[in-house]
């Protein structure tokens, strides 16, 4: 039987692969597939709080894999829709969903108080890569591979 569960890292992996194949071959079909995956994942995974803050109800590290795919697609198309949405949620979490040690909560909406809850590696260890990618997207740092 087929498992009906949907995970952001699966889509992110396929999205990254589609962009990589487009970059290597120049075949439009791969870019079209990447755009299809990006828009489909955007519609399926993103939810919004009452205040309009975007979030994805999955593990933050799993969401990072999707963000990698969005970042790769952004580098090709220049369309910031997907990366901007994730950055908005990330920045909100940075301000509203961290404990006294600065570690991010599992729930990036800040709707649950996780200050005293032990943190899980998959929730906290992804944050530096998120912000490294944000810095690349904003042009604050360069990716040495792309020089």
Question: Residue locations for each model-derived region?
Answer:
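Inter-helical turn/loop segments and adjacent helix faces that build the functional surface
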Residues: 21-28
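CBM-like carbohydrate-recognition segments
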Residues: 6, 31-147
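Structured, solvent-exposed acidic/aromatic patches
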Residues: 1-17, 60-64
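"A position-specific structural signal for the A-helix of alpha-solenoid helical repeats
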Residues: 17-20, 69
